[in-house]
Amino acid sequence: MSKFDMIIGYNAVKKELKQIADTLRNREYYEKLGVSAPRGLLLHGEPGVGKSLMAAAIIEASGRKAFVCRKDQPNGDFVKHIKETFDKAMEEAPSIVLLDDMDKFANGDEEHPDAEEYVTVQSCIDEAKHKEVFVLATVNNMRCLPKSLYRVGRFDRLIKIREPEGNDALEIIRHYLKNKQVAEDIDVGIIARIMDGRSCAELETVVNTAGLFAGYARSECITMEHLLEACLRNVFDAPPTTNDSDDMISHANLTNPNNEGTQIVYHEAGHAVVSEVLRPGSVTLAYVYKRLNNRGGFVEYYDDQTYTPLYRDLSRIACALGGIAANEWKFGVTDIGGGRDLDNAFSEMKDLVINRGICGLHLYSYGYRDANSQNLRAEQEQATAKEIEKIYRKVKEILSLNAEFLEKLADALSRKKLLSAADVQKIKSECKIVPVAL
């Protein structure tokens, strides 16, 4: 198996990397066309997305000898090591120099991008320019580098490696589950949606943690419950559902408006209902918990890119208000736990008013306008509050028209504490859903 075969997903990126490797291995075909191979490639992105494996795949496919340079020496010795690495590469050209985690060559400080190490790298790249030395670098934080280092001529290609999303996340999770004992009813698609946008390393850790849970429970296979528990533990840093000895959320208290656990349940159910009405299929996880000194819950959403950006923004604001509205609609009480939701809703709406001009261009703030004008700020804040009130009324309408869905979801949350997307969709299928337009 080649190293390119070991890269799961990322088909568009792999295609581009293979093309670059081909220019290095078969340069005579390109020379006949009068074109030259790129001099350098920089792969950048968050840690754990597979940059090092991709770099290794290019080296293998190119057929060239590689000289690796990574920060594993004191500063003075390391500068010397950089020069020696390029000297060896030029002696054995055609070759590749791999600058692994190049943003760590200096102090990793964004305030000091002109460190001696980077100056040395620039000088060495320029010296090797006509010596058939291809420079390959991996970087986590581009802001640590001087812009002159990654300009065209030094690195002709810059490729951002993003966290896996959609089918990429699905393929990677399937790969990590492939050689493990798993239950037949595992829905990999649900886990992929929960983990959408997380690094490959996080996906691998969740699958392995699920296996550890299964082993400790002496289970014959990894179940959906184990995977969901692993998501709670590794992704959301939430308390587990398995230890219920001090669980203070009870289905028996579901009609008691003064019970804090009940308010938590309806709060999270409100978020979920609003999201499912406005963006069907968007809820990936709903969780509630209340222990002696630890309480809360959350609803995780899948950001469906098929909706317009403005609709996604407005629906996020509506979802944020759903928890507060649910307790007001159900019990007529103010939800004291909704402060963060209100902050998020007002912050997003203020951005739409000030930076997107949704309430008129007279409220738009631009570079040379006096954004600190008291009158302008007062108008912007008034417009923001007015729009929030308008959406809040819509949210209460959604909950009122879909009361059956809200009640059944709250009932299920109070019993199970953790609901997957499949659980939510099953409950939803049993209810009459009334669409409401924002």
Enumerate the language-model features and the residues they cover.
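Activation segment
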Residues: 106-108, 146, 231, 273, ...
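Active-site phosphate-binding and catalytic loops of NTP-dependent enzymes
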Residues: 25-33, 131-132, 240-242, 277-286, ...
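Walker A/P-loop NTP-binding motif of AAA+ ATPase domains
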Residues: 2-192
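Soluble catalytic regions of large protease machineries
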Residues: 46, 249-266, 272-438
